[in-house]
């Protein structure tokens, strides 16, 4: 595919496990990618180079309005349009605390990125997408939010994370409703237990739970499992699908006796 035919995808949290794999998958399937993360550009130069010439890196914090604006401006300046937005960036509380000990500072930190930052970046991207021509399927762009099984599963040692992801599910529904007539499908993916840096600190706990049968498929999920799902929601494969939550968790959500 020539550069002039490539579609542009914006990916947040691009230097993390799911974000990086998502960028690789989109790049391998005809997209150019503009990605953002909090890592300084010189500190992730090797990883950025691994993604190739069709990748542009923007260092920034999703919680900051100016950084969100810079990300969108970079994508428009370099590619003239945004065909897909993949909201991957997310943080867990820096310290896991019982719900009765959770601090407002921790709550604000998690919500500021996971929910507020994603909501307002999506607003910026949607405003741009609305100005674009419809594709052969009648759509102007695609938006995918990476939520979590924690959106519907209680974990009282990280309540702020659960609330942030439950809120993100409503963000998905709101934008799906508002943008449907504009030809912009908005969906979310709810990963289960995925092998990333975020879960590495509790690997022993989840190894034990998986061995005991928590996940019917009997294994950890991988970032590639999520990236493939993202692609199907960005490339027109599911062009008539919006407001949906795609659960990718090896069956963990199934109620069993």
Model-derived segments and their meaning:
Residues 15-16:
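Conserved glycine-rich cofactor-binding loop
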Residues 127, 176-178, 239:
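Alpha-helical segment proximal to the catalytic Tyr-Lys
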Residues 148:
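Residue(s) in the substrate-gating loop at a strand-loop-helix junction
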Residues 180, 185, 241-243:
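Short, small/polar-rich loop/turn modules that mediate ligand/substrate recognition or access, typified
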């Amino acid at each position: 595919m020539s550069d002039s035919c490539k579609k542009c995808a914006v990916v947040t949290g691009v230097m993390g496990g799911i974000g990086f794999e998502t960028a690789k998958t989109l790049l391998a399937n005809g997209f150019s990618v503009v990605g953002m993360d909090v890592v300084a550009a010189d500190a992730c130069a090797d990883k950025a180079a691994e993604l190739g010439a069709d990748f542009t890196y923007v260092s920034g914090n999703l919680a900051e309005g100016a950084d969100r604006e810079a990300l969108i401006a970079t994508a428009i300046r370099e590619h003239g349009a945004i065909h897909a937005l993949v909201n991957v960036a997310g943080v867990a509380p820096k310290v896991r605390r019982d719900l009765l000990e959770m601090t407002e500072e921790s709550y604000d930190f998690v919500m500021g990125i996971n929910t507020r930052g994603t909501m307002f970046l999506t607003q910026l991207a949607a405003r741009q997408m609305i100005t674009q021509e419809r594709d052969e399927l009648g759509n102007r762009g695609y938006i995918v939010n990476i939520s979590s099984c924690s959106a519907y599963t209680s974990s009282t040692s990280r309540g702020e994370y659960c609330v942030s992801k439950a809120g993100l599910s409503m963000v998905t529904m709101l934008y799906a409703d508002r943008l449907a007539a504009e030809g912009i499908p908005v969906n979310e993916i709810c990963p289960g237990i995925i092998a990333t840096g975020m879960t590495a600190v509790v690997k022993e706990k989840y190894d034990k739970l998986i061995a005991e049968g928590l996940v019917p498929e009997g294994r950890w999920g991988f970032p590639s499992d999520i990236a493939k799902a993202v692609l199907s929601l960005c490339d027109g494969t599911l062009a008539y699908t919006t407001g949906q939550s795609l659960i990718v968790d090896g069956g963990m959500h199934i109620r069993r006796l």
